[in-house]
Amino acid sequence: MATFDDFMKLDIRVGTITDARVFAKARKPAYQLQVDFGGELGVKRSSAQITEQYKPEELIGKQVLAVVNFPPRQIADFMSEVLVLGTYSEGGVVLIRPDKDVKNGDKLG
């Protein structure tokens, strides 16, 4: 069982998607995302399996939550630096987003 201390080790931040493209070399359908987390963290890259619910052009400008302190993960020829968070639903993964615009880099609290 996970503890509250385990949860507190995660650094979950808000970022804005600035680029989204089809990740043709991924084994499962995915997009390559660039997410801007503001001054402290800057722009990070992520591979996200969210193709069932979103088109790449719909993602630009959306704020999302992501874990920013996992080690980078090589996926095909792409280095994924953050884990964008979503919920599994019948129609595919749905992104977890703030319900109001907030500053990029804000921490989940």
PLM region spans:
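Phosphate-backbone binding interfaces of nucleic-acid-interacting proteins
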Residues: 1-109
